[in-house]
């Protein structure tokens, strides 16, 4: 019996013997291909070869590629569906074609794997007579060759045009005793009797947008065979979880949960989900994916949270995914060494994300159960689904899956409406927006919609013509002194805000007036809006004008923009290749760079990043740009941002020869790195889970920042009566002394509150058969209030306690209810909720204890007086 590792090696060795070059698996993150979410097939890393923009060292290649598909996540847990899998493939780029591909595939399965030929069936595309003839040459009888349509046996194009071709598949027949039992059953039947082993794609046509196909001058081969499916077959197992690929991982899940595999369907499903998703998230994180609210990061977060949910169903209440990931690494790192190399990072990321979700999971599940109980009409509202997503981190797919188990559906349209409301709020809160002079209606009615010709890479001053003028009221023919407007030019040296770089400022001057440009915006149609105000005179449409940017400001922006590029390289050098840009802002006075990283940077790491950037500045490296076809840029390894839309031709910005940095960028930059002068990090902070932000300054601003730090240190040293070197120690001693005094004050407060609590016991009264103690306390904080309530509850034995105080100039309430009264329907959370509303706030909690606050401290006594009405 073949092991899965032997099958992988056996396949690659076979094709090496056929003259193929063995190619290692590429990352699950497609290399410089923003059009793809994740690597979904073996041919992805060879796309430039198939598209003719690059030439391989050897036109024959073979690989075992790790792949990831997201279409059937909810189906994972059955016997067949996987997210992450390995695909064996052999590829020909204009070398061999159908004859060799078919002959070698047949030779491999029948002679190397020794699969009985009588168990194999073939499917071909409807009119691919050539393929049928070639299969017959291999000895396949015609009654085991089935013609199928395009849905099953035609590949591509990947879009509305491009390379495509018919395909042919090898299927294994489990026998008539499996499936529907019909005598005429064949691979077109979905009864389970037949299992696809291998798909051979014959890339022989180029299809245009009209659907017309022409033969490619050099047809190619792209094949794919799932290792997991092949292993099931060769090890005579019922499903992949019983093979040696997954068995150690499933065994770990059983060990952690105390459950046995194979005892009942529900347990088996949960064990499979935990095992499969653990493997998927381990590989995703090792390849640089981080949890996020969108894109591939959302896929990772969704899998991890689904694994945690099904872990709970196995009784795994404590974090367990780190242990599961360890089992995955132990099993797979011999083949994929990057797992071992990045083990610490992977496990830290998993631990952080699992802990984050666990904080809200229990409360979220309680809310979901309540929603299920209250749902009428068999459908959970989009508003409820959104609350579970937004407040408790439940992916809507997970809510849908749980609801389906209860016989309910989810209003996904309503959920999407809530999401759009949130997105709209987010957009409205952003700094970037069109002002009144550039409203949608005005833009719609523009008289000049041709793209503005940008000449600002070479020129700071440009003679131009005013093509349109927009004001709050719409388009106008002229503007006068004091008028605010947006001017459209046919040619402009002004850079329009885009790609994180702010727009240029400056002046537009005509024979009759002067216009101050305060910002430049880039419309979706390519038109630049020069926004500002008329300083003097009058400007008219069709008038000749001279556009002049603020050159000093532009130079400051350029320093920061080039520094941002070098910074990204430095972060990858210091923190690792998993670092990815998640956003940037470049202004004249500073730069901001958001990037993926799990934990705060250490002082040493920040120092090393600064040293890297400043070293490149001192070297005065050339900074230069060139235009090239987009695909050529990707083949050269130029950095592109996922999710960005690029045209056929792109601008590549490089720093150094050879390049220290090479990125697709349309912004403005210095001509040599020495112009940056100096780089200094101001701060490094968190802006979300797995997301960090650096703010930095360059040039004059860096010098000013350092001077400010030195002045502050000198002032502090004077106050501490110490040298600059001694100040940190002196400050630490002073802080320790303050902390000691604070503790002494807190102890004194506790003693005073305990005495006050003893007096409060006498104020407890019987009200409607319940011991009720309501009081306002003074000069106590929230912690002391809780300790007092604990003391009173223990002393009363049975009762309802409501205490109020003013802390940080706001009212604060706390309620405790003893267990015997909870059984009678009294609920601390409901009481606090009503109290907080009276004081203009909110709050709530559990039946036994709840707390809340308000905004109006003058309402504290009124709220406490209302307690009896709530009993």
UniProtKB/Swiss-Prot annotation:
Pfam families: DHHA1 (PF02272), tRNA-synt_2c (PF01411), tRNA_SAD (PF07973)
Keywords of this entry: Aminoacyl-tRNA synthetase, ATP-binding, Cytoplasm, Ligase, Metal-binding, Nucleotide-binding, Protein biosynthesis, RNA-binding, tRNA-binding, Zinc
Cross-referenced InterPro entries: aa-tRNA-synth_II/BPL/LPL, Ala-tRNA-lgiase_IIc, Ala-tRNA-ligase_IIc_anticod-bd, Ala-tRNA-synth_IIc_core, Ala-tRNA-synth_IIc_N, Ala-tRNA_ligase, Ala_tRNA_ligase_euk/bac, DHHA1_dom
A GO cellular-component term linked to this record: cytosol
Recorded GO MF terms: alanine-tRNA ligase activity; aminoacyl-tRNA deacylase activity; ATP binding; tRNA binding; zinc ion binding
SMART domains (UniProt xref): tRNA_SAD
Reaction(s) the record says it catalyses: tRNA(Ala) + L-alanine + ATP = L-alanyl-tRNA(Ala) + AMP + diphosphate
EC number: 6.1.1.7
Location (main, coarse): cytoplasm
Family matches, as Gene3D superfamilies: 2.40.30.130, 3.10.310.40, 3.30.54.20, Bira Bifunctional Protein, Domain 2 (3.30.930.10), Threonyl-trna Synthetase, Chain A, domain 2 (3.30.980.10)
GO biological process: alanyl-tRNA aminoacylation
Cofactor comment: Binds 1 zinc ion per subunit.
Location of the protein in the cell: Cytoplasm
Note on domains (UniProt): Consists of three domains; the N-terminal catalytic domain, the editing domain and the C-terminal C-Ala domain. The editing domain removes incorrectly charged amino acids, while the C-Ala domain, along with tRNA(Ala), serves as a bridge to cooperatively bring together the editing and aminoacylation centers thus stimulating deacylation of misacylated tRNAs.
HAMAP family xrefs: Ala_tRNA_synth_B (MF_00036_B)
Biological function: Catalyzes the attachment of alanine to tRNA(Ala) in a two-step reaction: alanine is first activated by ATP to form Ala-AMP and then transferred to the acceptor end of tRNA(Ala). Also edits incorrectly charged Ser-tRNA(Ala) and Gly-tRNA(Ala) via its editing domain.
Family under the similarity heading: Belongs to the class-II aminoacyl-tRNA synthetase family.
Full protein name: Alanine--tRNA ligase
